[in-house]
């Protein structure tokens, strides 16, 4: 089945569910229409350099995380054939009728794994025009063998190992950090893969496929198999810039926890996805997270206590604060809640 050949019954009822928010449409049009978005070239890190020119490769990665908060990696070790197979499985499951996605255990996942729209949205600017499967790494396997499910698990494992390697490089790359530096310990129980689909959005200015946000993890890895449908944008120098899709690379971005741990050396950059008026977009994202009890505190060898920009907090405390803010305001406030200077 071609990607543009789908039954509209597979789409979540976004327009009818959130019609009460569309009184804000004129303001969204004006806000988005005033933004001139240029296309950017993200820094590209060839991970083959870790074997051939290790120090140069590590320095390039540290520079990209500091200056951009985003970078692409090539020769990352995740087979392209596996990523294509994941994309095909992703397209197939999102093609299923909406009612099946919300009620049945597709691919052996509970219906609660399927999410769509933004239930907490209080205005149109907070609505994400998307649907997704949120898949924790430790999700129990189904009793029957499902090839697509096995592919998801293979990709999750490969992404977890890659993300751990990249996070360690960045942690050890901070000024004053050495081989004895204490690392933030990650846990499979809190890491997850998210399969995204952004349906076509017929609103005048397209709308947000995913609202502007930063990631609440240590590190995120994103892949998009399509090379013809863009949409990912990040904030650079006070302006939104568009990221050109590249199926052969993986996009890596710094999360809030790594920004806090690095004492603002690395940047968790605000980013968003713009929905397309006529084309659907698919992507995959892996989120590297620590245990809920892990203490995030910028007081390791590279930071004196008096110079710390944040008070110490656990990942569990951070998540709880975010959920409270989203419930009360409709949006995430994030690191500002924990900043001391």
Curated annotation (Swiss-Prot):
The keyword tRNA-binding does not apply. Residues 187-290 form the Fe2OG dioxygenase domain. Binds 1 Fe(2+) ion per subunit. Fe cation binds at residues 213, 215, 271. The keyword Iron applies. GO terms for molecular function: gibberellin 2-beta-dioxygenase activity; metal ion binding. One of its GO terms (biological process) is gibberellin biosynthetic process. Pathway: Plant hormone biosynthesis; gibberellin biosynthesis. InterPro entries: DIOX_N, IPNS-like_FE2OG_OXY, IPNS-like_sf, Iron_ascorbate_oxido_reductase, Oxoglu/Fe-dep_dioxygenase_dom. It comes from the Eukaryota. Keywords: Cytoplasm, Dioxygenase, Iron, Metal-binding, Nucleus, Oxidoreductase. Its cofactor is L-ascorbate; Fe(2+). It catalyses: gibberellin A1 + 2-oxoglutarate + O2 = gibberellin A8 + succinate + CO2. SUPFAM superfamilies: Clavaminate synthase-like. Its EC number is 1.14.11.13. 2-oxoglutarate binds at residues 198, 281, 283. One of its GO terms (cellular component) is nucleus. It is an enzyme of class 1 (oxidoreductase). Catalyzes the 2-beta-hydroxylation of several biologically active gibberellins (GAs), leading to the homeostatic regulation of their endogenous level. Catabolism of GAs plays a central role in plant development. In vitro, converts GA12 and GA53 to the corresponding 2-beta-hydroxylated products GA110 and GA97, respectively. Belongs to the iron/ascorbate-dependent oxidoreductase family. GA2OX subfamily. Plant overexpressing GA2OX5 exhibit an extremely dwarf phenotype. This is Gibberellin 2-beta-dioxygenase 5. It comes from Oryza sativa subsp. japonica.
């Amino acid at each position: 089945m071609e990607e543009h050949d789908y039954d509209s019954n597979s789409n979540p009822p976004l327009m009818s569910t959130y019609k009460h928010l569309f009184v804000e449409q004129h303001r969204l049009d004006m806000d988005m229409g005033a933004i001139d978005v240029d296309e950017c070239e993200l820094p590209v890190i060839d991970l083959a350099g870790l074997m051939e020119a290790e120090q140069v490769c590590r320095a390039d990665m540290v520079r990209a995380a500091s200056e951009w908060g985003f970078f692409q990696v090539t020769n990352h070790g995740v087979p392209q054939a596996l990523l294509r197979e994941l994309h095909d499985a992703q397209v197939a499951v999102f093609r299923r009728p909406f009612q099946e996605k919300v009620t049945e255990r597709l691919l052996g996942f509970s219906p609660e794994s399927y999410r769509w729209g933004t239930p907490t949205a209080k205005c149109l600017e907070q609505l994400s025009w998307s649907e997704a499967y949120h898949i924790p790494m430790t999700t129990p396997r189904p009793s029957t063998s499902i090839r697509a499910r096995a592919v998801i698990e293979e990709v999750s494992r490969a992404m977890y190992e890659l993300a751990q390697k990249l996070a360690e490089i960045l942690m050890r790359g901070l000024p004053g950090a050495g081989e004895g530096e204490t690392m933030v310990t990650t846990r499979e129980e809190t890491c997850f893969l998210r399969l995204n689909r952004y349906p076509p959005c017929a609103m005048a200015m397209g709308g947000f496929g995913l609202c502007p946000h930063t990631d609440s993890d240590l590190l995120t890895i994103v892949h998009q198999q399509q090379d013809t449908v863009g949409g990912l944008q990040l904030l650079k120098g006070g302006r939104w810039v568009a990221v050109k899709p590249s199926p052969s690379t993986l996009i890596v971005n710094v999360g809030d926890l790594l920004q806090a741990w690095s004492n603002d050396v690395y940047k968790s950059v605000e980013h968003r996805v713009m929905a397309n008026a006529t084309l659907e977009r698919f992507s995959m994202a892996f989120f590297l997270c620590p245990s809920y009890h892990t203490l995030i505190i910028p007081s390791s060898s590279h930071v004196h206590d008096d110079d710390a920009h944040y008070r110490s907090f656990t990942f569990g405390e951070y998540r709880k604060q975010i959920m409270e803010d989203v419930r009360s305001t409709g949006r995430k406030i994030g690191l500002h809640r924990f900043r001391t200077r």
